[in-house]
Amino acid sequence: MEDWLQFPEPAPAIRHYVTAQSAGAVRNWLFLVAGLVFLMVIVGGATRLTESGLSIVEWKPITGVIPPLSDKDWAQAFEDYQQIPQYKELFPQMDLSGFKYIYAWEWGHRLLARLIGLVFFIPLVLFWLKNLLPPGVKPKLLLILALGALQGGVGWWMVSSGLVHRTEVAQERLAIHLIIAALIFASCIWVAGGLGSVQPIIIHEHKSRLRLESILLMVFTCLQIFLGGLVAGLRAGLVNNSWPLIDGVFIPSSATLWALDPWWINLLNNPLTVQFIHRMTAYVLFLIALTHLIDSFLNTEGKLKRGAIIVFLHIIVQIILGIATLILVEPPFNGAPHILLALGHQAVAMAVLAVVTLQTRRLLSS
């Protein structure tokens, strides 16, 4: 009978070697990845604004890291580009030197994507094997890894949309590509933000309301970034270049907003509608940030109050840049100055997402 009551020896517990120093290393690594993703978004924006995104018409995840090296290779790459509608309809006068310029942007964009993959994957494996990852972090890192793999496929899915029947990529695919990059960026910051030293969060009252405001800030910031991708893909920023009115009115007529049939197509394909929604979402985001600022001043102290100020100031700067990008399209601001302005608008959008992510994390973990 005694034999029946004997249980096998328990397996030895997995030993973790997580220290404040190792957690700090993981934190710094994730902030580095976030910084590279930030740079990636800016390079991607420049690639789009210079009309370079369709210059490489094939997807070779491994061998594609090597650019054309000989005159023969360059001639072949240029010939491949000459077969797509963008070259035939928009740039039939482009010569080989012009092609090399746009090729460099797209190749650099793809090279940076590969670099980010390595910078994320190799340290992840090392931290994992040495049991240096804090408890609960592994599933989050695997999710970020999955998002990165998905992003690679979505990038080619986006490019392929502009190779046959269009002279540019599909705007909805561009917006999806951008929002996935934003989610990877925010996820790295979210996880890294939880690995620092814990400081007390002081909230006198209305904690639930403050949390709701922070969640709304996250949701509307991500929505606004997605809408920004649609605006970019449709070139909707080049129509109705006035503010605060659109053709003399604050709200355009329903006949213009819903000109396409069925009605929901306007949400993706009507430049006026997309620009109008982008404007209105900016106003909503401003009001949420202002409400959060007031509530934080009345009910919090320390980091939360400072965080609310930083979020509000970032959104103010972003609105100013958005208005400037919209209205400054004539000389002397067209061309390179306007490209720099648009890239600044895109960069600050990511900065807004970063500070909103940190503020939301503080509130939800308090």
Question: What is each residue range found by the language model?
Answer:
Residues E2-S366:
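Polytopic transmembrane helical bundles with strong interfacial aromatic enrichment
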